[in-house]
Amino acid sequence: MTAEGDGSFKPGPPTERRGEAPDRNLAMELVRVTEAGAMAAGRWVGRGNKEGGDGAAVDTIRELVNTVSMRGVVVIGEGEKDHAPMLYNGEEVGNGDGPDCDFAVDPIDGTTLMSKGMPNAISVLAVADRGAMFDPSAVFYMNKITVGPDAAHVLDITAPIGENIRAVAKVKDLSVRDMTVCILDRPRHAQLIDDVRATGARIRLITDGDVAGAISACRPQSGTDMLAGIGGTPEGIIAAAAIRCMGGAIQAQLAPRDDVERRKALDAGYNLDRILTTEDLVSGENVFFCATGVTDGDLLKGVRYYAGGCTTQSIVMRSKSGTVRMIEAYHRLSKLNEYSAIDFTGDNNAAYPLP
């Protein structure tokens, strides 16, 4: 306000809202979102209905994320608005307060794993400053290679896989035969698998869930030294958020499926020969990553039910501090159902005893 000559005041010009950076409290708000998504999907484990489980997780995450203090825009979600009524790309999420953020979510990474009761299904999300995440819309797949912090400086996606394996083994003080490479089990990877086997390295084939595989490659004592191969671009960006927090490295190149997708990418200005680094995929200093296990896996334990409640295990990371937290939580479903808008019981007639 400014003073007039008669001592009265009049409003001054409006001031712009200062950009607000995501703070550390956001991490705990976000992990509640993936916990809820995992608990909702946990009721569908092994039931052979991946759409039902994914839908339950989507509904729950959307309900919870709109209580989080942020002004988020979905950069990676369930698809375009016409095909995804919730968590579609471009949707605004959060409660309207707090920092402006890019929001990436995969309610269930590994829907087939969940539906079959197989290991390594997780509920996962990432948050970064607005404009920090690479736009994945032009090309659905990318070729990627991932390693942990100790080998980040020797990674070269343009080199043969054998050279990468030998370089990583050298800096990790391993023999090539000690190395384990994680690869999605797909027909397109037949040559890659042959090339890795020719080096003498071991292979860990996974049917789905390459976000968890990429994180395992960055974690000591995980038993995985590298992830390689073609996988989803959205999953690559979400994995890059985790890798930013862990100090590892991912390199990627867009991999169009056909001439139509290639032309679409070129028309949109993408350089298909460009090597995308971790920072190209997710830039900025404020990157958050959260994941909660749905089924037991190498990265996280799945949702486990007991009389009166369930337990979840989550991993929460923040790039600014470099902190990685493992969170074990016990949820009293009998208490949650007293106030939550979400039905975590999966049975309207259930009467859980108190634990």
UniProtKB/Swiss-Prot annotation:
**Region (Disordered) spans which residues?**
1-25
Pfam families linked: FBPase_glpX
Q: Name one GO molecular function term.
A: metal ion binding
Give the enzyme's main class according to its UniProt record, as a single word.
hydrolase
PANTHER family this protein is in?
FRUCTOSE-1,6-BISPHOSPHATASE 1 CLASS 2-RELATED, FRUCTOSE-1,6-BISPHOSPHATASE CLASS 2
Catalytic activity reported: beta-D-fructose 1,6-bisphosphate + H2O = beta-D-fructose 6-phosphate + phosphate
Q: In which pathway does it act?
A: Carbohydrate biosynthesis; gluconeogenesis
Question: Which biological process terms from the Gene Ontology are attached to this UniProt entry?
Answer: fructose 1,6-bisphosphate metabolic process; gluconeogenesis; glycerol metabolic process
Main subcellular localisation: cytoplasm
**Protein localization:** Cytoplasm
- Species of origin reads Mycobacterium leprae (strain TN)
Q: Which family, according to the similarity comment?
A: Belongs to the FBPase class 2 family.
Listed SUPFAM superfamilies: Carbohydrate phosphatase
EC number(s) recorded for this UniProt protein: 3.1.3.11
Keyword tags? Carbohydrate metabolism, Cytoplasm, Hydrolase, Manganese, Metal-binding
Question: Where is Mn(2+) 2 annotated to bind?
Answer: D106, D109, E235
GO CC annotations? cytosol
What cofactor requirement does the entry state? Mn(2+)
Binding positions (substrate)? D109, G110, T111, Y141, R186, P187, R188, D208, G209, D210, G232
Q: What does this protein do?
A: Catalyzes the hydrolysis of fructose 1,6-bisphosphate to fructose 6-phosphate.
Per UniProt, Mn(2+) 1 binds at D54, E78
Name recorded for this polypeptide: Fructose-1,6-bisphosphatase class 2
Q: Does the keyword Hydrolase apply?
A: yes
